[in-house]
């Protein structure tokens, strides 16, 4: 701005020579002399601004309004202007000014629990063991154990229902604690609890922070061993009940001779033997009914040796009229080259055309008959030629 005025005047002389001293701003060293001790604004602000006509005329409106506000501040009372002064520094005040803050310190009990009320680092088994060992008689009741823990550890004075349940469970499910009934001389409520005589090495060097090993009573171990030994026998008996004699899994390892011996003790087998006559060819109505009942009793899953053993000597099965058309009949299972041989043999034995014989059972069949005291009245041709040429493939019976 000053350079612009100098260019308009085009006068090389100094700017200070054009105005008098009372028409110019006074220096800052002169303004400090008129400032009061409790104020930061001078009282003659309005006089200074009015003595500068060249600035008041050239300044815009907002600047003049600011000057008016400054002038109004000068006319305010001296006390109000002093209240606007900036706050003094804290260094000017003595240290006693902040002493009141120490009175509002936080109570340590509100945010940090006392060490005496902290949870003890012992398990419930350790607490019970310590309580019993310090007792004079080395035995305590349940209520005495509760009271000992509460007196020694203030932490357990709260939530008593929770940790007392844990104490009861520890006493019941650990072999190191033995329940002792009350004697007649000491009547009262509740039994005594003591330590097992062999549980002395449960803690290392008397340190109850951690157990060395879990104590297990030898009697309980032997009881578990007996249960394990008896268990397979029970399972075997159950399997025998579920799978009767004569089914595939049992009859596969049984011989026809052994099956006949067992079948003789069976009620069905005995009735068949009693109904059977001296001749295997002659059948009575009673034996036919027994044979039919035995067929209904044992389904298709029966193996041949087990089936023959249960039926006994009555091997004359009831003829199925639809066996020729059945998909699993003997005519469907036999090969074409053996059809003619089978037809010739059936013509030679017209009375035994409904019998089903196997070559591998011929010797066992005679043994069974001789053991039971039955006379086998068969022709020599049947013994020599018929069983040697019979088809030996297993056949599914059509019931």
From Swiss-Prot:
<dbReference type="InterPro" id="IPR013638">
    <property type="entry name" value="Fork-head_N"/>
</dbReference>
<dbReference type="GO" id="GO:0006355">
    <property type="term" value="P:regulation of DNA-templated transcription"/>
</dbReference>
<dbReference type="GO" id="GO:0000978">
    <property type="term" value="F:RNA polymerase II cis-regulatory region sequence-specific DNA binding"/>
</dbReference>
<dbReference type="GO" id="GO:0030154">
    <property type="term" value="P:cell differentiation"/>
</dbReference>
<dbReference type="Pfam" id="PF00250">
    <property type="entry name" value="Forkhead"/>
</dbReference>
<dbReference type="GO" id="GO:0030900">
    <property type="term" value="P:forebrain development"/>
</dbReference>
<dbReference type="InterPro" id="IPR036390">
    <property type="entry name" value="WH_DNA-bd_sf"/>
</dbReference>
<keyword id="KW-0238">DNA-binding</keyword>
<dbReference type="InterPro" id="IPR050211">
    <property type="entry name" value="FOX_domain-containing"/>
</dbReference>
<dbReference type="InterPro" id="IPR018122">
    <property type="entry name" value="TF_fork_head_CS_1"/>
</dbReference>
<dbReference type="GO" id="GO:0009653">
    <property type="term" value="P:anatomical structure morphogenesis"/>
</dbReference>
<dbReference type="InterPro" id="IPR018533">
    <property type="entry name" value="Forkhead_box_C"/>
</dbReference>
<dbReference type="GO" id="GO:0005634">
    <property type="term" value="C:nucleus"/>
</dbReference>
<protein>
    <recommendedName>
        <fullName>Forkhead box protein A4-A</fullName>
    </recommendedName>
</protein>
<keyword id="KW-0804">Transcription</keyword>
<comment type="function">
    <text>Transcriptional repressor involved in embryonic nervous system development. Plays a role in the induction and patterning of the anterior-posterior neural axis. Involved in the establishment of floor plate differentiation from neural plate cells during gastrulation. Binds the anf1 promoter sequence to restrict expression of anf1 to the anterior of the neural plate, thereby patterning the forebrain. Can bind to the HNF-3-alpha DNA target sequence. Cooperates with t/bra in a dose-dependent manner to specify dorsal mesoderm formation, including notochord.</text>
</comment>
<dbReference type="GO" id="GO:0003700">
    <property type="term" value="F:DNA-binding transcription factor activity"/>
</dbReference>
<keyword id="KW-0221">Differentiation</keyword>
<dbReference type="GO" id="GO:0043565">
    <property type="term" value="F:sequence-specific DNA binding"/>
</dbReference>
<keyword id="KW-0805">Transcription regulation</keyword>
<keyword id="KW-0217">Developmental protein</keyword>
<dbReference type="GO" id="GO:0000981">
    <property type="term" value="F:DNA-binding transcription factor activity, RNA polymerase II-specific"/>
</dbReference>
<dbReference type="Pfam" id="PF09354">
    <property type="entry name" value="HNF_C"/>
</dbReference>
<dbReference type="InterPro" id="IPR036388">
    <property type="entry name" value="WH-like_DNA-bd_sf"/>
</dbReference>
<dbReference type="Pfam" id="PF08430">
    <property type="entry name" value="Forkhead_N"/>
</dbReference>
<feature type="compositionally biased region" description="Basic and acidic residues">
    <location>
        <begin position="219"/>
        <end position="234"/>
    </location>
</feature>
<keyword id="KW-0539">Nucleus</keyword>
<keyword id="KW-0524">Neurogenesis</keyword>
<dbReference type="GO" id="GO:0006357">
    <property type="term" value="P:regulation of transcription by RNA polymerase II"/>
</dbReference>
<keyword id="KW-0678">Repressor</keyword>
<feature type="DNA-binding region" description="Fork-head">
    <location>
        <begin position="119"/>
        <end position="213"/>
    </location>
</feature>
<dbReference type="GO" id="GO:0009948">
    <property type="term" value="P:anterior/posterior axis specification"/>
</dbReference>
<dbReference type="GO" id="GO:0001707">
    <property type="term" value="P:mesoderm formation"/>
</dbReference>
<dbReference type="GO" id="GO:0019904">
    <property type="term" value="F:protein domain specific binding"/>
</dbReference>
<dbReference type="InterPro" id="IPR001766">
    <property type="entry name" value="Fork_head_dom"/>
</dbReference>
<feature type="compositionally biased region" description="Polar residues">
    <location>
        <begin position="267"/>
        <end position="277"/>
    </location>
</feature>
<dbReference type="InterPro" id="IPR030456">
    <property type="entry name" value="TF_fork_head_CS_2"/>
</dbReference>
<feature type="region of interest" description="Disordered">
    <location>
        <begin position="219"/>
        <end position="290"/>
    </location>
</feature>
<dbReference type="GO" id="GO:0001840">
    <property type="term" value="P:neural plate development"/>
</dbReference>
<dbReference type="GO" id="GO:0045892">
    <property type="term" value="P:negative regulation of DNA-templated transcription"/>
</dbReference>
């Amino acid at each position: 701005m000053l350079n612009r005025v100098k260019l308009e005047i085009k006068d090389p002389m100094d700017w200070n020579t054009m105005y008098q001293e009372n028409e110019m701003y006074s220096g800052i060293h002169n303004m400090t002399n008129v400032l009061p001790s409790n104020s930061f604004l001078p009282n003659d602000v309005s006089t200074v601004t009015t003595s500068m006509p060249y600035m008041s005329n050239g300044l815009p409106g907002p600047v003049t309004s600011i000057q008016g506000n400054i002038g109004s501040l000068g006319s305010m009372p001296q006390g109000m202007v002093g209240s606007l002064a900036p706050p003094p520094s804290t260094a000017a005040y003595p240290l006693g000014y902040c002493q009141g803050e120490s009175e509002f310190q936080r109570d340590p009990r509100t945010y940090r629990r006392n060490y005496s009320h902290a949870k003890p680092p012992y398990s419930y088994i350790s607490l019970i063991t310590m309580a019993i060992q310090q007792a004079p008689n080395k035995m305590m009741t349940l209520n005495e154990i509760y009271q000992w823990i509460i007196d020694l550890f203030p932490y357990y004075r709260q939530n008593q229902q929770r940790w007392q349940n844990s104490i009861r469970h520890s006493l019941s499910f650990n072999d190191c604690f033995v329940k002792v009934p009350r004697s007649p001389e000491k009547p009262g409520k509740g039994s005594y609890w003591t330590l097992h005589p062999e549980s002395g090495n449960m803690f290392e060097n008397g340190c109850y922070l951690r157990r060395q090993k879990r104590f297990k009573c030898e009697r309980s171990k032997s009881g578990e061993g007996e249960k394990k030994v008896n268990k397979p026998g029970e399972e075997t008996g159950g399997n025998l009940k579920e799978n009767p004699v004569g089914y595939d899994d049992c009859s596969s390892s049984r011989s026809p001779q052994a099956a006949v011996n067992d079948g003789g003790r069976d009620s069905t087998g005995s009735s068949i033997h009693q109904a059977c006559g001296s001749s295997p060819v002659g059948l009575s109505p009673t034996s036919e009914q027994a044979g039919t009942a035995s067929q209904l009793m044992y389904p298709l899953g029966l193996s041949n040796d087990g089936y023959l053993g249960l039926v006994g000597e009555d091997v004359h099965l009831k003829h199925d009229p639809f066996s020729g058309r059945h998909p699993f009949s003997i005519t469907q299972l036999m090969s074409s080259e053996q059809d003619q041989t089978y037809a010739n043999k059936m013509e030679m034995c017209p009375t035994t055309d409904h019998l089903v014989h196997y070559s591998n059972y011929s010797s066992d069949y005679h043994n069974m008959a001789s053991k039971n005291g039955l006379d086998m009245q068969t022709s020599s041709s049947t013994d020599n030629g018929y069983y040697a040429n019979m088809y030996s493939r297993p056949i599914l019976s059509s019931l």
